[in-house]
Amino acid sequence: PNITVIASAVAIRYLRNIVNIDFKSQAVKMNDVLDLGGRTLKFISAPNLHWPDTIYSYLVEEEILFTCDSFGSHYAFDDVLMSKLPVEKNDDYMDALLNYYNPIFAPFKTYVLKAIATLSGLNVKMICPGHGPVLDARIEEIINIYKEWSTEDFSAEKLVVIPFTSAYGYTKIMAETVKEGIVMVNPNVTVRLYDLDIKS
């Protein structure tokens, strides 16, 4: 009952709302440090990865980064360390990494890139995510994969989808007019109309 919860200010606020009791707390922010008696934790703000209150914790002396959900996967094998991942399991792991990234981090690509930028000055020997293997190997590779996945490809086709339903045809005319306006402003955009009416 006398522990002190150390977290971002947002996390402390959320936790107070969840547990409905008061507790001792210490809010930490970007670059704050905590002396654990011979070991030092440095905190790195990483909002929306994938919670608004996320912070990374860096164990300075050991060069270990605790990243909450970042660089994680829903993947398990007979060991814990990435260096022990059998070569024949690599494709499964990479699929799991992507399947974890897409729903959790793809909506927050700009935040992923900001977090990666804050890591550029750190020596990291190990990443401990909340899920999946502990990255004691391939650290730079996995970070670069996240960076690649989070970098927008502006050469990709620009597409506008206009779904509509039209009981009497007027909404269809409006949708077609919007399409014409878009193409007039930018002829390099592909515009697709989708009639949502259910045909019997």
Per-segment meaning from a language model:
Residues 1-6:
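Active-site metal-binding motif and surrounding structural segment of the metallo-beta-lactamase
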Residues 9-13, 30:
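Short, polar loop motifs at secondary-structure junctions
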Residues 12-15, 73-74:
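Short gly/pro/ser/thr-enriched loop/turn and capping motifs at secondary-structure boundaries
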Residues 20-87:
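Catalytic core of the metallo-beta-lactamase
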Residues 45-55, 102-110, 192:
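Active-site glycine- and acidic-residue-rich loops that bind
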Residues 60, 64-65, 71-94, 103-156:
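Divalent-metal (often Zn2+) His-rich catalytic cores of metallo-beta-lactamase-fold enzymes
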Residues 98-109, 164-168:
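Short acidic-aromatic active-site loops that bind/stabilize oxyanions
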Residues 138-200:
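N-terminal beta1-alpha1-beta2 submodule of the flavodoxin-like/Rossmannoid cofactor-binding fold
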